[in-house]
């Protein structure tokens, strides 16, 4: 099934192109706090249930904590029961993907398309309409209410 998010999310402007951010490791360390740096730059994972964004129910936009790029709308969020903020889709052009081989089996990892900060992994156990679950580290996000 094809699913288009165009026009569904009022208040979200489509991105024509994304200018990459290129900062040194030292610059990232001075910009981010220790936990943000660990997750966004070192591909870490926060403890499940540790993010206040798990319980966030207001309408708004979830941005990358590293560069403020809008990644998800609250309309895409759902309670996966995993302990991490989860979304069934993402805003156009906001994410980049690669395969993560850190565990025994390969996983699809996603990053911010602008600053390449690590956000989480994609799983095929999400709700309709996509059947996908973008499992995000809450520390890697900033919530901006409408």
What is each residue range found by the language model?
Residues 10-17:
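Boundary at the C-terminal end of the N-terminal hydrophobic targeting segment
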Residues 1-4:
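N-terminal export leaders
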């Amino acid at each position: 099934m094809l699913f288009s998010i165009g026009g569904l999310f009022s208040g979200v402007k489509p991105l024509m192109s994304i200018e990459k951010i290129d900062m040194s490791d030292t610059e990232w360390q001075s910009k981010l706090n220790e936990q943000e740096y660990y997750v966004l730059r070192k591909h870490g994972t926060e403890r499940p249930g540790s993010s206040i964004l798990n319980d966030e129910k207001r309408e708004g936009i979830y941005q990358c904590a590293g560069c403020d790029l809008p990644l998800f709308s609250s309309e895409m969020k759902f309670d996966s029961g995993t302990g991490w903020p989860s979304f069934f889709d993402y805003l156009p052009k906001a994410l980049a993907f690669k395969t993560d081989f850190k565990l025994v089996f390969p996983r699809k990892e996603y990053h911010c398309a602008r600053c390449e900060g690590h956000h989480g992994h994609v799983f095929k156990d999400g709700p309709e309409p996509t059947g996908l679950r973008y499992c995000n580290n809450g520390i890697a996000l900033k919530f901006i209410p409408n």
